[in-house]
Amino acid sequence: IEKAYMKIHGGYDFPGSNSGIDLYALTGWIPEGFHMHDEKFQKHRTWQRLVNAHKYGDCLVTVATGQMPEEKADALGLVPTHAYAVLDVREACGVRMVLVKNPWAHMRWKGKYSPEDTKSWTVAMRRALRYDQLSAMQRDNGIFWIDYASMCEAFNGLYLNWNRDLFQHHTSHHRFWPANDHGPKNDSYNVGYNPQYTLTVQAPAAKDPSLPKSRSSSAVWLLLSRHVVNKRAESDTTPNQYLTLHVYKNKKRMFYPQKPYMSAPYSNNPHTLVRFDVPPGETLTYTIVVSQYEKEFDLSYTLDVFSMANFRLVPLSRTLGSEVRLDGKWSSSSGGGKVSSAGGSARHITFMNNPQFRLKLA
């Protein structure tokens, strides 16, 4: 498996990935990642999602450490820039606990609630988790319990891979976006030439009207995946391709990047996920805009739409309803009484000599 995975990524010198990307390549389950040290990370809400997902077996969970000094890593019992599997998620005696495994099958957590921690563990907690602390002390198999608060502090990345069968409706759209395409290199002021789509979602009515709308809404997930086309050429350029998706609540092509309804931060991760919900009983149309931070390289990508409700995805045409082209030129005065049509800026008295056109909208 490792050889096959490395081959499709161009060899063992590929730029690297994370456990969420790897699990998507191996299983096809939808990747979602969080930086637990980010100020926008919602610790409580994420815990609830972890508990619910683990209860039904619809999510693979992994965590990863970041860079850290060797002394700190030894003190914590962790491996820097290393991925760990999450085996269990539970709350015991009011403490949020996570069962983690080092895939090396040795080297484990030395902090709070480690096997050597005799102060934090209580008889009630050990009983609730069916944890034999004495046996754990005698054998280091890389498996350990850690409280959720310590996990969020000691680890950097949290990666969730969701079962795509959770969604009844799905479609994929593949596209090539050349770097020399029309439009500015930086789309901060104009996204009119970016690839765009209209997405119409028909959310069914709530089965139980007494439930709040948030519990009856239809989930819609958009996954933008960048293709690896030329492995050698992309080994240096890939980190510079920062992509995102912008979602607007309208039915037409966007030209100016106003504040979107939903969006994701620009990232050089090959997968970008945007999630939102459609209220029950409503049919809403959205415009989806694919964006690059700096359009320097050709981009081949896939846009996947996963939805609990029926939907229709249509690529937006760049062709406008009416188009007229007029040829003209700026010319300088060449004598003989001819007036220059290059009148300059509005600060010049000759400004009115610039070419002018009248536009009448019917």
Model-assigned labels for residue ranges:
Residues 1-362:
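Accessory/interaction modules and long regulatory regions
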